[in-house]
């Protein structure tokens, strides 16, 4: 395999989704870390520079607007990190707030992995 494309953090409380995303992105050349909960993601962000964070908006114990904390935390600690939010329950209000806080992409689940990869690659090229 050639050079790695960058470092990616995947945040999702569903282990099957976390595993599938991690395996897919590793397979196309990314270095991948993953977190199951908000606190774990924040700890990783505090000590590691990521090219992109892909986070589920709803984690265990985190719902609605509270799920946007990952955007604020990422922007505060690592302004250069691109943030992609995934959700199965989008509302126009939450999407607008996510974008206002600095989310680079707000995507509806399910999303084909090649399409997600293309979005991530585009964000990295833009930065």
Predicted regions mapped to residue ranges:
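Alpha4 helix (beta4-alpha4-beta5 surface) of REC/receiver domains from two-component response regulators
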Residues: 65, 69, 90-107
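The short loop immediately C-terminal to the conserved phospho-acceptor aspartate in CheY-like receiver
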Residues: 58-61
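Conserved acidic carboxylate
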Residues: 12
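Two-component/phosphorelay signaling modules centered on CheY-like receiver
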Residues: 15-33
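Short amphipathic alpha-helix used as the core "switch/output" element in two-component signaling
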Residues: 43, 65-79
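Acidic, metal-coordinating helix/loop segments flanking the phosphotransfer/catalytic sites
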Residues: 34-52, 76
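C-terminal output helix
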Residues: 93, 111-120
């Amino acid at each position: 395999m050639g050079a790695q494309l960058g470092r990616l953090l995947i945040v999702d409380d569903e282990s099957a989704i976390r595993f599938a995303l991690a395996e897919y992105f590793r397979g196309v050349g990314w270095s991948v870390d993953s977190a199951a909960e908000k606190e774990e993601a924040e700890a990783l962000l505090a000590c590691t520079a990521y090219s992109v964070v892909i986070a589920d908006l709803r984690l265990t114990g985190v719902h609605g607007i509270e799920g946007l904390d990952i955007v604020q935390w990422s922007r505060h600690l690592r302004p250069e990190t691109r943030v992609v939010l995934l959700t199965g329950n989008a509302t126009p209000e939450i999407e607008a707030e996510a974008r206002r806080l600095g989310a680079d992409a707000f995507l509806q689940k399910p999303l084909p992995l090649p399409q997600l990869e293309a979005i991530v690659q585009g964000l990295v090229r833009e930065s």
